[in-house]
From Swiss-Prot:
Keyword terms of this UniProt record: Blood group antigen, Cell membrane, Cytoplasm, Disulfide bond, Glycoprotein, Immunoglobulin domain, Membrane, Phosphoprotein, Signal, Transmembrane, Transmembrane helix
Gene: ERMAP
Molecular function (Gene Ontology), one example: signaling receptor binding
Similarity section: Belongs to the immunoglobulin superfamily. BTN/MOG family.
Tissue expression: Expressed in erythroid-enriched bone marrow (at protein level). Highly expressed in bone marrow and to a lower extent in leukocytes, thymus, lymph node and spleen.
Domain B30.2/SPRY: 220-418
Record's protein name: Erythroid membrane-associated protein
Any single biological process term in GO: regulation of cytokine production
Length: 475
């Protein structure tokens, strides 16, 4: 028995080296070749063949598959000991996912890893123990994504179309968003523009309202000033008469030298230097060299007339151009409701209400000649000039205008107060430039105006003293 036991021990001692001798030879024959590298698909099964091979029929005492390197934690992926798999000390991520496959005839040991993950990629050590001897070697696992060829055509189409579709949807959404933003921006700009226009309109409307209000106020003040100026001008009323020695030969004067009209033919009158021989005009008898003077001329329904003031030195012979530069400050009604101030150039205008009686005011020191519409108590026009030398009233009844302008010009002997017509009386004899008599119907004349003293005394006590020393204003 002892001999048999010793013989068995000796045989065992000889077989173990032989087993590992084959293992060593196998390893040396495959060291560094491509068999140590294994590739597995993601989600598939990896089969890691241990480079160490055993003699056929040999049952290893222990087989360990370890991850290398994994410091400070268990490295065991799979453990086979004493003929069965062991679960202790295994890495948690590999539990239930490994299978050890032994081929006794080939003497090979293979580790299968199920449901391969990306983190399974790396080095693995295969350790085999037979008896008291153990050997180990290393293999490397590479994890690859599934190839397109392994996918179904529908999956491939979906994989291609889906990203493109998502991209198109994103592009469409981006374009829609940009269009919406552009519309919102345009709408905002339009709203802003409308707001600005409304704001500007409101501002302009406010400015226009203020301007109109200011103009109305100014017009009211001007009307009040003109009315006040006309009323104060009337305080300087003078009774003007006509000078027959200056009358054109075709003019016919009344007996009281206050009415003049155009005759049909020239009258036999002396040709003196003071007489107009071309311009059908006549001057007043008064000479003004200082102070304020006001007179009124009734024009009635005449269609043409010229009234005003001229210098004593104006030319009486031949054609004369009436202008302030030549010593004329005249106002003319040319036709209908058209009026002209004979400035240089002429100033044309229309009046809201044609005057039936015209008031003329002269302030010599102030250099002012103003015309007033006595009918509605409004101002018509004002000349300004630095006067020198005597000034005289000027009258021109103008041509007959087809029979529409035959009425005379009548100088009011008193202030005109109403719209009564002043017409020549049929009785009596008339005379040319003093020879033909024209009398005025006294019943048609306006009533006699009260004296200036009576006007002042009728005013309130606080205004009387001030008006007694009042002079006409400068315009």
């Amino acid at each position: 028995m002892e001999m048999a036991s010793s013989a068995g021990s000796w045989l065992s001692g000889c077989l173990i080296p032989l087993v590992f001798l084959r293992l060593s030879v196998h390893v040396s024959g495959h060291a560094g070749d491509a068999g140590k590298f294994h590739v597995a698909l993601l989600g598939g099964t990896a089969e890691l063949l241990c480079p160490l091979s055993l003699w056929p029929g040999t049952v290893p005492k222990e087989v360990r598959w370890l991850r290398s390197p994994f410091p400070q934690r268990s490295q065991a992926v799979h453990i086979f000991r004493d003929g069965k798999d062991q679960d202790e000390d295994l890495m948690p991520e590999y539990k239930g996912r490994t299978v050890l496959v032994r081929d006794a005839q080939e003497g090979s040991v293979t580790l299968q890893i199920l449901d391969v993950r990306l983190e399974d990629q790396g080095s693995y050590r295969c350790l085999i123990q037979v008896g008291n001897l153990s050997k180990e070697d290393t293999v490397i696992l590479q994890v690859a994504a599934p190839s397109v060829g392994s996918l179904s055509p529908s999956a491939v189409a979906l994989a291609v179309i889906l990203p493109v579709l998502v991209l198109l949807i994103m592009v469409c959404l981006c374009l829609i968003w940009k269009q919406r933003r552009a519309k919102e921006k345009l709408l905002y700009e339009h709203v802003t523009e409308v707001d600005n226009l409304l704001s500007d309109h409101a501002k302009e409307k406010g400015k226009l309202h203020k301007a109109v209000k200011k103009l109305r106020s100014e017009l009211k003040l001007k009307r009040a000033a003109a009315n006040s100026g006309w009323r104060r001008a009337r305080l300087h009323f003078v009774a003007v008469t006509l000078d027959p020695d200056t009358a054109h030969p075709k003019l016919i004067l009344s007996e009281d030298q206050r009415c003049v009209r155009l005759g049909d033919r020239r009258q036999p009158v002396p040709d003196n230097p003071q007489r107009f021989d071309f311009v059908v005009s006549i001057l007043g008898s008064e000479y003004f060299t200082t102070g304020c003077h006001y007179w009124e001329v009734y024009v009635g329904d005449k269609t043409k007339w010229i009234l005003g003031v001229c210098s004593e030195s104006v030319s009486r012979k031949g054609k004369v151009t009436a202008s302030p530069a030549n010593g004329h400050w005249l106002l003319r009604q040319s036709r209908g409701n058209e009026y002209e101030a004979l400035t240089s150039p002429q100033t044309s205008f229309r009046l809201k209400e044609p005057p039936r009686c015209v008031g003329i005011f002269l302030d010599y020191e102030a250099g002012v000649i103003s015309f007033y519409n006595v009918t509605n108590k409004s101002h018509i026009f004002t000349f300004t000039h630095n006067f020198s030398g005597p000034l005289r009233p000027f009258f021109e009844p103008c041509l007959h205008d087809g029979g529409k302008n035959t009425a005379p010009l009548v100088i009011c002997s008193e202030l005109h107060k109403s719209e009564e017509s002043i017409v020549p009386r049929p009785e009596g004899k008339g005379h040319a430039n003093g020879d033909v008599s024209l009398k005025v119907n006294s019943s048609l004349l306006p009533p006699k105006a009260p004296e200036l003293k009576d006007i002042i005394l009728s005013l309130p006590p606080d205004l009387g003293p001030a008006l007694q020393e009042l002079k006409a204003p400068s315009f």
